[in-house]
Amino acid sequence: MRALDTWKLTGAGYYSYLSVNVVCKRTCLKKESTPQREEAVQTAVRSHANFAEYVPFTFGLLFLAELNGAPTSWVHAAYTALFAFRVSHATLGMHIGNGMNLGRKIGFLGTLAVMLGAGLYLSLIH
């Protein structure tokens, strides 16, 4: 069984959570028109968009790495790290923090590290 088979449901589940969060922020806070409401909606939208920008591409790189012989345990570790970094970025960094706290920075840099690591692996195998 490929590592992607284990992690695709986790990715889809977290993306769905972020999608529902956007809908909730837009509808539940619709009655208010305050700067706090607008900021909450914007934060939810950015968290959702950031996931959509980085995760599908990184999933593709990790899938290709595994198809090209990367050890499944390494790929599982990379998916685990990617998920932890995305939660750190979105949930801890953007929703709980003030938007530019340590959780967001670690999440962003960690995501880049996983993406670049997978890309580097693919570059070096040929």
Which residues does each predicted region cover?
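Interfacial segments of alpha-helical transmembrane regions
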Residues: 1-13, 75-79
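Juxtamembrane loop-transmembrane helix junctions in multi-pass integral membrane proteins
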Residues: 2, 40, 44-50, 70-73, ...
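Transmembrane alpha-helical segments that form the membrane-embedded catalytic/substrate-channel core
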Residues: 11-28, 83-93
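Cytosolic, membrane-interface loops and tails of multi-pass inner-membrane proteins
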Residues: 19-46
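Core segments of transmembrane alpha-helices
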Residues: 49-64, 115
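Short alpha-helical packing/oligomerization segments
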Residues: 61-84
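Interfacial loop-to-transmembrane junctions
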Residues: 88-113
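Juxtamembrane boundary at the C-terminal end of a transmembrane helix
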Residues: 119-126
